[in-house]
Amino acid sequence: MSEKIHIFDTTLRDGEQAPGSSLEVEEKIEIAKQLSKLNVDVIEAGFPVSSKAQYQAVESIADMVNGPTIAALARCIENDIEKAYQALKGAEKYRIHTFAGTSDIHIMGKFSDHKYGKDLNEKRNTIIKMAVDAVSFAKSFTGDVEFSPEDAGRTDINYLCEIIEAVISAGATVINIPDTTGYTMPEEFGEKIKSVKKKVKNINNAIISCL
């Protein structure tokens, strides 16, 4: 990938999680139009499966706002990905952004059921398969697929590199490396990004994003 910097704006999705923040669909459309005027590269418009209002907002922005790529969030679940596609399909350009928790804390909390594995290592392998399957499924709808290893800041670096390499091989074109809980110091997070770039063999086949 080239060294061009791409501006990814998530005001309408992650920004709305701020305490007291709640936007009507019409307000989201207006913000998206203003972001388009600013020439941002990607607008993450929402999480379509989470509510009817979220779906409507993403669908309306996809239909009405031209210029930027319109992105929608989806868990590593086929129904989420299908909903994202249905909301996005009217867009000039669109991206499906899928994610899975990868830190030990997230894995043992969100994937505690034995169906995901009897121990941490088995659960880690299950999550890699889920992520690969999700990226492959999303690729059937669009060539532009982003993957986020949620809570990357607290994720074991070797496991982080393993799952990133696997999803890039499956077709992910953007890898977001989020410090979801604000756990790491800036220097520490920078070292984590350096390690990913050094250890992931196919990292040059994807854009790295850090949110």
Task: Describe each region flagged by the PLM.
Residues S2-I7, D14-V42, Y55-M64, E78-I208:
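Alpha/beta enzyme core
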Residues V40-P48, A71:
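Divalent metal-dependent hydrolysis catalytic cores, especially in the metallo-beta-lactamase
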Residues P48-A53, R75-E78:
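Short active-site-proximal "capping" loops at secondary-structure junctions
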Residues N66-A74:
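A glycine-rich helix N-cap at a beta->alpha junction
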Residues L211:
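Histidine-centered divalent-metal-coordination microenvironment in nucleic-acid enzymes
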